[in-house]
Amino acid sequence: MRLHATFAAHVNRYVTIIMDHPRVQAFMAEAKRRNPHEPEFLQAVEEVAETVIPFIESNPRYQGHALLERMIEPERVIQFRVPWTDDEGHIQVNRGYRVEFNSAIGPYKGGLRFHPSVNLSILKFLGFEQVFKNSLTTLPMGGGKGGSDFNPKGKSDAEVMRFCQSFMTELSRHIGPDTDVPAGDIGVGGREIGYMFGQYKRLRNEFTGVLTGKKPAWGGSLIRPEATGYGATYFMVEMLATQGESIDGKTVSISGSGNVALHAAEKCLRLGGKVIALSDSKGSIHDPAGLTEEKLAWIKDLKEVRRGRIKEYADAHEGVTFREGQDPWDLNCDLAFPCATQNELDGDEAATLVANGCKVVAEGANMPCTPEAIEVFHRAGVMFAPGKASNAGGVATSGLEMSQNSLRMSWTAEEVDGHLQRIMKDIHGQCVEYGRLDNGSVDYVQGANIAGFVKVADAMIDQGVV
């Protein structure tokens, strides 16, 4: 692949400048004082501040409004208890959250995550990222995030239903199609969305587009389950096109084996890529021959129906290796999609990826690469797309689902996929516009942050101090 020879040196100088920027340092010192013990949130804020504050200082329109100071404060944080009864008749109690971050350009929009690791720091980080991601789609959606420390794994359908009904009983007070429209995330799929939608309908006596990620039979959009993985792949296509390259013939390594990972793999296969790795929390599989449509269908059944472990794929297929406790980042590949969870790929693993020939990385999960990993990619001249840009396909299609609900009509899969491709192409174009460096290369982190900021900032200025 052709890469700009001076890219790494230019980025090194740029990173040094922004890290030594006194305004950035002062801003982050105050953010840390106000948000102690919230490392994930502060990590997300710092990444944005490092690029947006220099932009503000060079653009008088955005000065004097305390825009970034206001953006990092959620408009509303809701925390509540979620009591429910398990199959043995014992009462269990979990915590529920909804962080309504910013509504300057539309109703709050963002997923619900059910996982034991959920806490306020993680949800604030996700909600803050969502503000910029939703802005990049150009659709009228604000940013929010929510969830619970409930773990659906190992629970019966009846237990999951009772939990979802209890969770929605409180959440229903705070959401609505013109106020806040949640969706799914880790631990929240079609089953959970269905139970919550049913409870909302029961409580409010309204059949309305209050949630996205619904099944098509009752108000959902075609392509929604595939959208995040497909969108990340479409973004990768646009990145490669700037170098005169394509996915065809490239070796692809993907972490995760959930919704995003499997559909990124599916789209890569259809575009001629050779997908050699997937993973879950127990380890990763290496399939040197590459996945096929038949193999991928087997894994989808394993994960979505049987709810099994990726190791079972290695056990059932000759020539496939299961690597217990290992991520796929030490395998030789051309392209990488981190699609599992936040901070899964650190600096050492990034260095290994680079040494093994990886040239382009697109985040499928939210903030899966640590700051150290991103710096390694920049120094090596590896093209890197942050999740707020490359995984925006999911929320973009959620926005399309909202449009279909408002119009009381459904679009074909081809229509939705066409809209998705155009949106991802437009997001890439925005990143290039605001991320173009002096030497002609593109810093996608800078581009995504500034492009996302500008639309929200313009709306906040227009709407006054609220």
Per-range role (PLM):
Residues 179-183, 206-211, 254, 277-280, ...:
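General beta-strand structural signal in soluble alpha/beta enzymes
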Residues 28-29, 46, 50, 120, ...:
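Predominant activation on well-ordered alpha-helical scaffold segments within soluble catalytic domains
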Residues 5-11, 15:
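Short hydrophobic alpha-helical segments enriched in small aliphatic residues
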Residues 17-223, 455-459, 463:
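N-terminal ligand-binding/catalytic initiation module
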